Design a protein with these regions (language model features):
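An acidic, gly/pro-interrupted, aromatic-rich
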Residues: 1-125, 162, 172-203
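Short linear loop/turn motifs
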Residues: 24-27, 144-148
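Hydrophobic residues in alpha-helical segments
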Residues: 98, 114-115, 133, 150, ...
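Amphipathic alpha-helical core segments of compact helical bundles
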Residues: 103, 131, 151-155, 194
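Amphipathic alpha-helical substructures
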Residues: 112-145
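Charged, solvent-exposed helices and adjacent loops that form client-binding or oligomerization surfaces
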Residues: 149-173
Length: 203
């Protein structure tokens, strides 16, 4: 379900707020949606601090301009009561989880968590990432695929330091001792993990 897809990524990233109750919050969403819908009379002001990372249950909803990532994952419009949600599987959903500002930030934070909690060696960090996200013993084939992905991305960002700066370091702080290139590569790894069928469909 829409809220659970976001909440799971939020939880795995380590950013999720455990705060309960209180008013609705305004997590990141694509810019200018409200300005276009309301002729510039209203705007979506992204919440700051802990409220930015509260569960989807607390997200402000407006029927005329629903929160886009939830709408993409079949959240009901609230115009009528919904007994059962109809689930779909569309390419647009993958665009959200790969490119939406919030999901990219979740991937960045998950990368930081992998780096700081996973050990000192790359192989240990990748094993930690698999155990954390899939919640089962690490399979050799998955580890090999993830290692190949990491090495390829690391080589890419070593040749393109400006691209590494674009991907990591603006929202989530750089861990002590880490390089931007390494964290950018880990962010791609984290993004891929958050988009696995085992995470989105079976998690």
């Amino acid at each position: 379900e829409a809220e659970m897809v976001r909440d799971q990524a939020l939880s795995l990233s380590g950013l999720q707020s455990v705060k309960m109750h209180g008013p609705s919050v305004y997590p990141p969403q694509p810019p200018n949606l409200w300005q276009a819908a309301f002729n510039g009379q209203r705007s979506w002001v992204t919440s700051k601090g802990e409220d930015r990372y509260r569960r989807g249950f607390y997200t402000f909803l407006r029927r005329t301009v629903p929160y886009p990532s939830m709408a993409t994952f079949d959240a009901p419009s609230r115009e009528i009561c919904t007994v059962r949600r109809i689930r779909t599987n569309t390419p647009l959903q993958s665009f959200v989880t790969l490119n939406d500002e919030a999901y990219v930030e979740f991937a960045q934070a998950l990368a930081r968590r992998i780096y700081t909690e996973g050990g000192n060696l790359t192989v240990d960090r990748l094993k930690f990432a698999l155990r954390l996200t899939l919640a089962k013993p690490v399979e050799a084939r998955r580890l090999a695929a993830l290692t190949e992905l990491f090495n390829g991305e690391l080589a890419y960002y070593q040749e393109r330091p400006d691209a590494a700066k674009e991907l990591f370091g603006k929202t989530v702080p750089l861990p002590p001792g880490a390089s931007l290139r390494e964290m950018a590569a880990l962010t791609v790894v984290a993004n891929v993990l958050l988009n696995l069928d085992a995470i989105l469909m079976k998690g």
